[in-house]
Amino acid sequence: MANLDHLALLKSGAVRWTKWREDSPEISPDLSYADLTGINLRGRNLSNVNLANSNLSNAILIAANCETANFTLANLSHSLLMKANLSNANLSIANLQDANLKGAFLGAANLIGADLQGANLSNADLENVNLIGANLQNANLKSANLSEAKLIRANLNEANLTEAHLNYADLSHANLGSASLVGAILYKAELRQANLNDAYLHKAYLFDANLSQARLINADLRWANLRGANLRGANLTGANFRGAIQNIISEEI
């Protein structure tokens, strides 16, 4: 449970909270299970704070420093986290439905099993983030950096990954049905047994990507760069490869 003194300091205002954090760097504030619905924490220093199981729905955390904070099982639905620093934060099984994380920094964060359905992650930095089993259905990841991200078994159905960077990302067994990957960069990405049915991969860069046993039924791969891609055992029924065929050298269509 939350430390009542820590909670009182948080609610006393930005000036007192900031001074206390500066004067007591050895203390890791405990705000677990706290009801912080709609609270304004814009720009606050929440680094290393325990917010597990807290309710931060509709909270304002714009440009907040949440580095290494613990948000396990926290409710952050509809929260505003634009340009927030969530690097190395633990957001496992957190509820981030419809949260706005535009331009946020989540490098190496733990989002295993997190619910990001409908979340805005456009231009966010998600390099080396762990999103295994996460729900990203209808999420906006336009121009996001997902290089080396772990997206195994993630649900990205109808997600917007237009011009996203997915170099070396692991999307094996992921659901990318009807997702937009137009102009996305998937250099050496792992897409083994992924569902890409009806996905939009127009002008996508799939150089050396592993698409073995992937489902690409009715996928749009026009002008995609598939040089060196592994399509062994993939289901390509109805897929459109116009302008991309000449780039496929590892497998015959």
Named regions from a protein language model:
Residues 7-8, 16, 20-253:
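Tandem repeat scaffolds
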Residues 1-12:
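Eukaryotic acidic, serine/proline-rich intrinsically disordered low-complexity regions
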